[in-house]
Every structure is written in C-alpha cells, then in structure tokens.
C-alpha cells in the first residue's frame, strides 16, 4: 500500500506546475481530450527506491482561477484526511495573502506532516524573501522553482524522508482482494450490502494496518475473498461524496489495496467524466477490472441490441484497453450479483496466468513473421525470442530483438492484442517489454 502526498494552496501559486515537475509528465496540459483533462491531478512518483501517489487537490476545484474561500477549505480538509504528507505551496514573489494564512491555520491544527514549499524562487536572490513564511508556524520553508526544476530534487529527498514507514497488510489467507469502486450513487453501497446481506456471520472485518483500510472476509457460495474498503463506502456514507475530487481521492487507497476492481456504472446515466477518472486510477495502478452496469432494472428495453449499444459505448470510451468483462446487474433486485464475484475471481486468476515459453514462441513468432515491425532507415527489425517474466502482479512479456528502441507503441499494442487473441487475459492489464538480444 503506497503513501499519499497532497499538494494544497491557493490558485496561481504553481501547484499544477509542481505536480507536473514531480511526476515528470505534462499529460493533461498537452492532451486536453474530453474526459482526460483532470488526469493530471493524480500521478505516481518514484524517488530513491520509494514510491508514493501525488495528488493536486486544487485541481479538483472547477474554475480554479475563481476559487472561493470555501472551496479552498474543502480542498485542504480532503488533503488532511487522506494524505500522509501535505505540500503547502506558496508564492515567494507575492508573499503571504489572507488566504495563505487561513490555509496555514487549518494545517497547524492537523496531525499530518506539512512541508511549506516556497515556489517561484527562480534564482537564489529570492530565497531570503521566503523567511516571512516562518510566520505560518509550520517550520522551515523550502525554496524551489517548479518551472525550471531548481531544488525539486532536494524537495523529493525531504518528502521521502518525511513519509511514514509503509506497513504491509498481513492477511491470514492469500485470497483475492476485490474493491467495489465508482462515483457517488452508482450503487456501491447497494452492491456491498447485497453481497453481505443480513448474514453477518459470513463476513469478518479485519482492520488493516493502514489508516482506514478494512478487509472484509467473504465466504459464501463456494467463493472466498476479501472485500476492500477504506471506510469511504460503508463507514462514512455520503458525507462529502457530492464532491468529485473527494470521491476520486477516496478511491485511490481502495484501488491500491486491491487485486481486482469492480467499476460500477449507472445504467440511467451512462459513462461520465468521473467514471473516466476512476477508470484512469485503475489503469495507472495496473489492477484487474470488471465493469458493472448497475440499475439495469430501471431500463425498460433490455434487448440484445440495447446491451450491444451499451457495451460498444463503454469500450469506445475506455479504449485503448477494451479487454474487460461488462456485466449488466441490479444490486437492488440482486440480479446477476453472484456473476460479479465469479467474474472478479476469473480476472484474478488471469492475473497470475502463465504461458509456457515454447507455446508462446510457437504461436507468436509466425504472427510476427507475417506482420513484422516497420523497418527503420532500411534496417529490418527482427524479433527472435519471447518469454513471460516470472509471476508478478501483472502478466509481463519480453520480446527480444535487434533494434528494440525502434519498436513503437502501436506495434506493442499489436503484440498485446495478439497475445489476448490466443490466451485469455480478460480483465487484466499486460506489460510488453522490448529488449535487445
């Protein structure tokens, strides 16, 4: 289970720039496709062997240029509740504002480590100006320039030194860990209640060592697994779940703690931007996926044509990853809910599936010979050998060739698709690595 670091601060202090600098991406700023524009608010950072999730909580506020005090307060409260370390970003050029002081006042009362990041210190002459930030009472300000990267490496050193030691969840049995995720009112609580029902003797709540993690052991109908919850679904109910960034941030720990995620969609509303954001978290964490279209009892026309229409629309929105099961259920009437668990178990088993090396080469090499990678400057790229890496959390295949650097993503997708056509990896991501032979 990874740690979470949250970036907070008023608008225009450089939170998104810092986020892009630390995660090494410019993904959402460069690529403003519908449904992906909020992707930049969540990323993975690895530094000196330590990994953490980084969240720009301010990015979840709509029209963040015109943020009101109330929205900033909400943003900070979310960070306090969810994060292990908080980066409080301020602007060394403009100094302290009333809004900065209000944020600092809230942060002083919280029990999380806070690092004051004095941004826009683009040259060393500006560093002395950061002394006024001592008045926050939150310790020594850390001068950086997110725009040119000055001192951001030192900031990362400071962050990883401040992170709490990761505690490993020790569960009594090695069982699939299944998370029910989705935006508010998609039916998460209803599905969990349908699974658990009144038979409280069939479940055992195991408090995780990580804050707010709860593993509910489920054994019924011959199925055994842990239901992963971070107290966001059953314990806290609908408190603040109307806030999009709140429910998505809340999903992060649940997803990171799971093997397979059941993404709940509302049949009456189709697939929306918030569904896309949560799907993006599943993809980035390389978890197994089952998509459930809930509230199917409310749809009058349940013909195969309508089912096909829903299925096509979902796969188009979630492309390029389309090899996942889609189930049409009703948590309220308990229609097909057992199928959800059975399918999640199949996806879990696909994650640990191994293909014998001899069979892999026997099937894939003739395909590659018929459809070789594009030549580079007249040089032919020859893939000579394929193997699957030893069991990990994600099935991973290595293709050995003479010019690995010239095999691009479209051809890697082609290889992945051919593997999926020949072996059942439904619901699980696949890693494709190209190495020099």
Swiss-Prot record:
Residues 3-167, 176-352 form the EngA-type G domain. Keywords: GTP-binding, Nucleotide-binding, Repeat, Ribosome biogenesis. PROSITE patterns: G_ENGA (PS51712). It comes from the Bacteria. One of its GO terms (molecular function) is ribosome binding. GO terms for biological process: ribosome biogenesis. Residues 353-437 form the KH-like domain. GTP 1 binds at residues 9-16, 56-60, 119-122. GTP 2 binds at residues 182-189, 229-233, 294-297. GTPase that plays an essential role in the late steps of ribosome biogenesis. Associates with the 50S ribosomal subunit. PANTHER family: GTPASE DER (PTHR43834:SF6). Belongs to the TRAFAC class TrmE-Era-EngA-EngB-Septin-like GTPase superfamily. EngA (Der) GTPase family. This is GTPase Der.
